[in-house]
Amino acid sequence: MGCRDVHAATVLSFLCGIASVAGLFAGTLLPNWRKLRLITFNRNEKNLTVYTGLWVKCARYDGGNDCLMYDAAWYSSVDQLDLRVLQFALPLSILIAMGALLLCLIGMCNTAFRSSVPNIKLAKCLVNSAGCHLVAGLLFFLAGTVSLSPSIWVIFYNIHLNRKFEPVFAFDYAVYVTVASAGGLFMTALLLFIWYCACKSLPSPFWQPLYSHPPGMHTYSQPYSARSRLSAIEIDIPVVSHTT
Protein backbone atom coordinates (compact mmCIF):
# COMPACT_ATOMS: atom_id res chain seq x y z
CA MET A 1 0.00 0.00 0.00
CA GLY A 2 1.52 3.32 -1.07
CA CYS A 3 1.25 5.25 2.17
CA ARG A 4 3.04 8.30 0.81
CA ASP A 5 0.76 8.53 -2.22
CA VAL A 6 -2.95 9.17 -2.59
CA HIS A 7 -4.44 5.72 -2.09
CA ALA A 8 -7.74 4.37 -3.40
CA ALA A 9 -8.97 3.90 0.18
CA THR A 10 -8.65 7.61 0.96
CA VAL A 11 -10.33 8.65 -2.30
CA LEU A 12 -13.15 6.15 -1.74
CA SER A 13 -13.62 7.34 1.82
CA PHE A 14 -13.78 10.97 0.64
CA LEU A 15 -16.45 10.15 -1.96
CA CYS A 16 -18.38 8.07 0.57
CA GLY A 17 -18.23 10.97 3.00
CA ILE A 18 -19.62 13.39 0.40
CA ALA A 19 -22.50 11.02 -0.39
CA SER A 20 -23.25 10.59 3.32
CA VAL A 21 -23.32 14.35 3.94
CA ALA A 22 -25.64 14.78 0.95
CA GLY A 23 -27.92 12.12 2.42
CA LEU A 24 -27.96 13.93 5.76
CA PHE A 25 -28.92 17.16 3.98
CA ALA A 26 -31.77 15.37 2.24
CA GLY A 27 -32.95 13.71 5.44
CA THR A 28 -32.89 17.04 7.26
CA LEU A 29 -35.01 18.81 4.64
CA LEU A 30 -37.46 16.01 3.81
CA PRO A 31 -40.97 16.46 5.30
CA ASN A 32 -41.39 12.71 5.65
CA TRP A 33 -40.22 11.81 9.13
CA ARG A 34 -43.57 10.82 10.58
CA LYS A 35 -47.00 10.35 9.06
CA LEU A 36 -50.36 10.37 10.76
CA ARG A 37 -53.04 8.51 8.83
CA LEU A 38 -56.63 9.60 9.48
CA ILE A 39 -59.14 7.09 8.15
CA THR A 40 -62.74 8.07 7.47
CA PHE A 41 -65.69 5.71 7.17
CA ASN A 42 -67.58 8.08 4.89
CA ARG A 43 -67.50 6.81 1.33
CA ASN A 44 -67.82 10.34 -0.03
CA GLU A 45 -64.60 11.46 1.64
CA LYS A 46 -61.00 10.39 1.24
CA ASN A 47 -58.54 9.36 3.89
CA LEU A 48 -56.16 12.08 5.05
CA THR A 49 -52.47 11.67 5.80
CA VAL A 50 -50.44 14.26 7.70
CA TYR A 51 -46.72 14.24 6.88
CA THR A 52 -44.49 15.69 9.58
CA GLY A 53 -40.93 16.83 8.99
CA LEU A 54 -38.36 18.63 11.07
CA TRP A 55 -39.27 22.03 9.66
CA VAL A 56 -42.61 21.77 7.82
CA LYS A 57 -45.87 19.84 8.02
CA CYS A 58 -48.11 18.86 5.12
CA ALA A 59 -51.56 17.25 4.98
CA ARG A 60 -52.87 15.66 1.79
CA TYR A 61 -55.54 13.26 0.64
CA ASP A 62 -54.63 9.71 -0.33
CA GLY A 63 -53.58 9.67 -3.96
CA GLY A 64 -53.11 13.43 -4.11
CA ASN A 65 -49.91 15.41 -4.59
CA ASP A 66 -51.00 18.83 -3.36
CA CYS A 67 -50.91 19.81 0.29
CA LEU A 68 -54.27 20.83 1.71
CA MET A 69 -52.51 22.31 4.70
CA TYR A 70 -48.88 23.42 4.60
CA ASP A 71 -47.37 24.68 7.85
CA ALA A 72 -44.09 26.43 7.09
CA ALA A 73 -43.68 27.56 10.71
CA TRP A 74 -43.80 24.04 12.12
CA TYR A 75 -40.13 24.19 13.11
CA SER A 76 -40.92 26.70 15.87
CA SER A 77 -43.85 24.76 17.33
CA VAL A 78 -42.65 21.15 17.22
CA ASP A 79 -44.35 19.30 20.08
CA GLN A 80 -42.64 15.93 19.60
CA LEU A 81 -39.43 15.41 21.54
CA ASP A 82 -37.66 13.16 19.05
CA LEU A 83 -38.14 15.62 16.19
CA ARG A 84 -36.98 18.49 18.38
CA VAL A 85 -33.77 16.62 19.18
CA LEU A 86 -33.24 15.89 15.49
CA GLN A 87 -33.49 19.60 14.70
CA PHE A 88 -30.25 20.08 16.63
CA ALA A 89 -28.56 16.71 16.05
CA LEU A 90 -28.66 16.56 12.25
CA PRO A 91 -27.26 20.07 11.56
CA LEU A 92 -24.55 19.40 14.15
CA SER A 93 -23.72 16.10 12.49
CA ILE A 94 -23.52 17.80 9.09
CA LEU A 95 -21.11 20.43 10.43
CA ILE A 96 -18.87 17.79 12.00
CA ALA A 97 -18.88 15.70 8.81
CA MET A 98 -18.04 18.75 6.68
CA GLY A 99 -15.09 19.50 8.95
CA ALA A 100 -13.95 15.90 8.51
CA LEU A 101 -14.27 16.23 4.74
CA LEU A 102 -12.14 19.37 4.82
CA LEU A 103 -9.43 17.61 6.81
CA CYS A 104 -9.53 14.63 4.47
CA LEU A 105 -9.22 16.94 1.45
CA ILE A 106 -6.29 18.79 3.03
CA GLY A 107 -4.54 15.50 3.69
CA MET A 108 -5.02 14.25 0.13
CA CYS A 109 -3.91 17.55 -1.42
CA ASN A 110 -0.83 17.64 0.78
CA THR A 111 0.03 14.08 -0.24
CA ALA A 112 -0.55 14.72 -3.95
CA PHE A 113 1.22 18.08 -4.28
CA ARG A 114 3.98 17.83 -1.69
CA SER A 115 7.51 18.62 -2.76
CA SER A 116 10.02 15.79 -3.00
CA VAL A 117 12.78 18.07 -1.69
CA PRO A 118 12.25 18.91 1.98
CA ASN A 119 12.64 22.48 3.14
CA ILE A 120 14.05 22.67 6.64
CA LYS A 121 12.72 26.20 7.15
CA LEU A 122 9.15 24.93 6.70
CA ALA A 123 9.57 21.78 8.77
CA LYS A 124 7.35 23.07 11.57
CA CYS A 125 4.66 24.23 9.12
CA LEU A 126 4.24 21.01 7.16
CA VAL A 127 0.81 19.40 7.19
CA ASN A 128 0.73 15.83 8.41
CA SER A 129 -1.54 14.18 5.84
CA ALA A 130 -1.86 10.91 7.72
CA GLY A 131 -2.70 12.77 10.91
CA CYS A 132 -5.41 14.65 8.99
CA HIS A 133 -6.92 11.34 7.85
CA LEU A 134 -6.83 9.96 11.39
CA VAL A 135 -8.60 12.98 12.89
CA ALA A 136 -11.06 13.00 9.97
CA GLY A 137 -11.92 9.37 10.70
CA LEU A 138 -12.63 10.22 14.33
CA LEU A 139 -14.85 13.13 13.27
CA PHE A 140 -16.74 10.94 10.79
CA PHE A 141 -17.37 8.41 13.56
CA LEU A 142 -18.62 11.18 15.87
CA ALA A 143 -20.91 12.59 13.16
CA GLY A 144 -22.36 9.15 12.49
CA THR A 145 -23.07 8.63 16.19
CA VAL A 146 -24.73 12.04 16.54
CA SER A 147 -27.04 11.42 13.56
CA LEU A 148 -27.78 7.72 14.08
CA SER A 149 -28.88 7.76 17.72
CA PRO A 150 -31.82 10.20 17.42
CA SER A 151 -32.84 8.71 14.07
CA ILE A 152 -33.29 5.28 15.63
CA TRP A 153 -35.07 6.92 18.54
CA VAL A 154 -37.81 8.01 16.11
CA ILE A 155 -38.71 4.35 15.52
CA PHE A 156 -39.14 3.65 19.23
CA TYR A 157 -40.93 6.95 19.80
CA ASN A 158 -43.53 5.94 17.21
CA ILE A 159 -44.21 2.82 19.25
CA HIS A 160 -44.67 5.03 22.30
CA LEU A 161 -47.12 7.30 20.45
CA ASN A 162 -49.14 4.37 19.16
CA ARG A 163 -49.45 2.99 22.67
CA LYS A 164 -50.32 6.35 24.17
CA PHE A 165 -52.91 7.33 21.56
CA GLU A 166 -54.02 5.11 18.68
CA PRO A 167 -51.99 3.04 16.20
CA VAL A 168 -52.10 5.72 13.53
CA PHE A 169 -48.46 6.87 13.62
CA ALA A 170 -45.72 5.51 11.37
CA PHE A 171 -42.21 6.66 10.50
CA ASP A 172 -41.53 7.56 6.88
CA TYR A 173 -38.62 7.14 4.48
CA ALA A 174 -36.63 10.10 5.81
CA VAL A 175 -35.66 7.80 8.68
CA TYR A 176 -34.21 5.27 6.23
CA VAL A 177 -32.29 8.00 4.38
CA THR A 178 -30.73 9.33 7.57
CA VAL A 179 -29.87 5.91 8.98
CA ALA A 180 -28.24 4.92 5.67
CA SER A 181 -26.28 8.19 5.63
CA ALA A 182 -25.09 7.59 9.19
CA GLY A 183 -23.99 4.12 8.11
CA GLY A 184 -22.05 5.75 5.27
CA LEU A 185 -20.25 7.96 7.79
CA PHE A 186 -19.26 4.89 9.81
CA MET A 187 -18.04 3.21 6.62
CA THR A 188 -15.98 6.30 5.78
CA ALA A 189 -14.40 6.29 9.23
CA LEU A 190 -13.68 2.56 8.94
CA LEU A 191 -11.89 3.02 5.61
CA LEU A 192 -9.71 5.78 7.03
CA PHE A 193 -8.88 3.74 10.13
CA ILE A 194 -7.97 0.69 8.04
CA TRP A 195 -5.72 2.81 5.82
CA TYR A 196 -4.01 4.41 8.81
CA CYS A 197 -3.47 1.14 10.70
CA ALA A 198 -2.11 -0.55 7.57
CA CYS A 199 0.35 2.27 6.89
CA LYS A 200 1.59 3.05 10.39
CA SER A 201 4.79 1.51 11.63
CA LEU A 202 4.00 -1.27 14.06
CA PRO A 203 6.53 -0.38 16.82
CA SER A 204 5.15 3.16 17.13
CA PRO A 205 2.28 4.03 19.47
CA PHE A 206 -1.21 3.75 18.01
CA TRP A 207 -1.88 7.48 18.23
CA GLN A 208 1.45 8.54 16.71
CA PRO A 209 0.72 10.07 13.28
CA LEU A 210 2.66 9.25 10.17
CA TYR A 211 5.02 11.76 8.65
CA SER A 212 4.07 12.91 5.19
CA HIS A 213 7.61 13.99 4.29
CA PRO A 214 10.57 11.66 3.65
CA PRO A 215 12.11 10.18 6.80
CA GLY A 216 15.53 11.45 5.74
CA MET A 217 14.32 14.94 6.49
CA HIS A 218 14.66 14.28 10.21
CA THR A 219 18.41 13.76 9.76
CA TYR A 220 18.86 17.29 8.51
CA SER A 221 20.02 19.88 10.98
CA GLN A 222 20.36 23.60 10.75
CA PRO A 223 23.82 25.10 10.35
CA TYR A 224 25.63 26.21 13.46
CA SER A 225 25.11 29.88 12.70
CA ALA A 226 21.32 29.43 12.63
CA ARG A 227 21.19 27.79 16.05
CA SER A 228 20.52 29.65 19.19
CA ARG A 229 23.28 30.40 21.62
CA LEU A 230 24.35 27.12 23.22
CA SER A 231 24.66 26.84 26.95
CA ALA A 232 27.75 25.67 28.72
CA ILE A 233 26.17 22.28 29.32
CA GLU A 234 25.64 21.70 25.58
CA ILE A 235 29.24 22.62 24.66
CA ASP A 236 31.92 20.07 25.32
CA ILE A 237 34.59 22.03 27.20
CA PRO A 238 37.84 20.14 27.66
CA VAL A 239 38.87 19.87 31.27
CA VAL A 240 42.58 20.24 32.01
CA SER A 241 43.77 18.67 35.22
CA HIS A 242 47.08 19.58 36.82
CA THR A 243 49.00 16.89 38.59
CA THR A 244 51.60 17.63 41.14
UniProtKB/Swiss-Prot annotation:
Its main location: other. One of its GO terms (cellular component) is plasma membrane. InterPro entries: Claudin12, Claudin_CS. Keywords: Cell junction, Cell membrane, Membrane, Phosphoprotein, Tight junction, Transmembrane, Transmembrane helix. The chain crosses the membrane at residues 11-31, 88-108, 136-156, 175-195. The modification Phosphoserine is found at residues 228, 231. Residues 32-87, 157-174 are extracellular. Gene3D superfamilies: 1.20.140.150. It is found in: Cell junction, Tight junction; Cell membrane. Residues 1-10, 109-135, 196-244 are cytoplasmic. Plays a major role in tight junction-specific obliteration of the intercellular space, through calcium-independent cell-adhesion activity. Interacts with OCLN. This is Claudin-12. It comes from Bos taurus (Bovine).
